[in-house]
Regions:
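Generic detector of multi-pass transmembrane helix bundles and their immediately adjacent loops
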Residues: 95-219
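Extracytoplasmic
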Residues: 1-9
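Transmembrane alpha-helical segments that form the functional core of multipass membrane systems
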Residues: 9-118, 128-138
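Conserved small/polar residues in nucleotide/adenosyl-binding loops
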Residues: 241-246
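Loop-to-transmembrane-helix entry motif
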Residues: 2-3, 50, 54, 176-187, ...
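Internal helix-turn-beta structural module
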Residues: 208-240
Length: 246
């Protein structure tokens, strides 16, 4: 079955809707999406195929995405610069947490069929390294989202009340941040759960004990992926809001 026409129609409709509603920002976000895909497919994937260090490559790819995208979409200003610094800092922290989680849980990434094929046909590529890089890149989107939101919040609070004490601004910004964290945490989990719905059905009809299923390689991978993203999200909101105060 040839799906080319259908796929292009849906992509075109999505692009048109983004441009109509987002206007200039919508166009810039699409350019940013192109930069993101170019960084991942043009740099990260070939470098991983050559057996490069997954942590260093994922962080480098993340920086290569953030530098142009943040300034392109949000402009060259204090908000973008501070969000960039906060996101990069928290991304490095997320990389450390992901590395610790994978090593302590002894994840091998072999519960996924694609990873098994990579292990079979591309022995020079580290499956665990791919897993780690995936954790880091996966956390990047939510980190960028929360740092930009908190930067905008702090900026608006100071503009509305320039004489406010830093701690007052921090408390007010964190009230907004808590709402954002609450929505983003379950959004993050639901995004992963949606992709793993067939697996969830298989687990529900399995005769294996629940804890044995939850600690299997494939399920533990998704659980830890969501957990690392959620922890990094909370740390980003708290630390970044504090760092932006004068």
């Amino acid at each position: 079955m040839d799906r080319t026409t259908t796929i292009w129609l849906w992509l075109g409709a999505a692009v048109l809707l983004i441009i109509l509603v987002g206007m200039t920002r919508g166009v810039l976000s699409l350019i940013g999406l192109g930069i993101t895909l170019a960084a991942v497919m043009g740099f990260l994937v070939p470098a991983l195929l050559r057996g490069g260090d997954s942590v260093a490559l994922a962080i480098t790819a993340g920086a290569a995405i953030l530098f142009p995208v943040l300034f392109l979409v949000h402009g060259i200003n204090w908000k973008s610069a501070s969000a960039l610094a906060g996101t990069l800092t928290t991304m490095v922290l997320a990389a450390g947490l992901a590395n610790l989680a994978i090593s302590t849980s002894q994840l091998r990434g072999l519960g996924n069929e694609d990873n098994l094929l990579i292990q079979l046909y591309l022995p020079d590529v580290s499956v665990t390294g791919l897993l780690l890089a995936g954790f880091i890149i996966g956390a990047l989107g939510v980190l960028n989202d929360v740092t930009i939101a908190q930067a905008s919040t702090v900026q608006e609070l100071y503009e509305a009340a320039p004489r406010s004490r830093p701690m007052e601004v921090f408390r007010s910004a964190m009230r907004v941040g808590r709402d954002h964290i609450a929505s983003m945490v379950y959004t993050l989990v639901l995004a992963y759960l949606g992709t793993a719905l067939p697996l969830s059905i298989l687990l529900s009809v399995s005769d294996r004990p629940l804890m044995q299923s939850l600690t299997s390689d494939v399920v533990a991978t998704e659980l830890l992926r969501s957990t690392i993203g959620a922890v990094a999200l909370v740390l980003a909101a708290v630390s970044y809001t504090h760092l932006t105060l004068p």
